Amino acid sequence: MPSIEGEYILKFRDDQGIFSTGETSIILDAPDLIDSQQIFVDREDTDPTAFGGAKSNVTISGGALQLSNPAANLTGTYTFADILDLGAVFSLNVKRLIQAVGFTVGAANTIDGLIPAGTFWDDYAQNGNFDGPEINDVSALIAVRSTVSPPSNGSSYTDSDFSGKTFNTFANGTFKGRGFQFRLTLTSESTAHNISIQQLGVTANFESRTERSYVSGGSTSTAPLTSSSSASGLNVTFGKPFFVGTSNLGGANAFLPSVGITIIGAAAGDYFVLSNISATGFNIKILDSSNNPVNPAKQFTFQAVGYGKGV
């Protein structure tokens, strides 16, 4: 089962394709162990143009997405209208959202239509299937493909930017890239059955992380740094950049990291001033009680807490 909260109704199926007569219920309450920041929510069904992406053998009916004609094609695809651009390469946590129901092609879809003429309520659906026979042979899967390259046109991604990239089916998972494209695949195993997608979307988030390393020469280090005696201070570059938001995702610099400093051997009156905190680093000045750069210079360590880990 995917690690997504909710109740799962499970039936077993043998190698002949025959389902078990009964089912069982499992409730999954996923632990919330690590703080995270949601940066992207896409609902294709509630977009200004619902299900406005590219369609192959699927159509919109009654506000929902379904196979155009199972008798002609048992599989169809829908490519999400929105392509996610993080602005740089990160490892991203993605989770799907699907609300769907299977139905019999051409069957009545109201209680009045389903109840045979002359049948009393007490005689109807004694097996518990009030909306008709169970439909266990339809499915809907969301897949994602990604690219680490920037948009070829310099502004926004198109399908051609993902040429040669493979779609990977997921329920939730972590994927590396800058651009992410999503696709839904609908499948029926019977020409008599179809599937209706009522809600469709994905959410994406970054986990909180702590950075203590910095770039020094061509490598990274966690050793204490030495402050600068210059009035311009010392620029520190994080070992790995954070995600801080874009104009389309939360807002530019909406998620700047929080930086803590420990001065080693600080004298009375010594203090620090931080500036230019960004996705990639910060500037620090360590000053004495007269507001001058400390002399001799002092060593210090830092701890930055933010979201996402750049590649």
Label the predicted regions.
Residues M1-E5, D85-G87, G173-G177, S229, ...:
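Surface-exposed coil/turn segments at beta-strand junctions on protein surfaces, enriched
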Residues I4, D14-T222, V236:
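Beta-strand-rich ligand- or partner-binding modules
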Residues D42-F51, V259-G269:
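Short, solvent-exposed secondary-structure boundary motifs
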Residues G201-L256, I263-V311:
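Extracellular receptor-binding modules and their adjoining Ser/Thr/Gly/Asp/Asn-rich linkers
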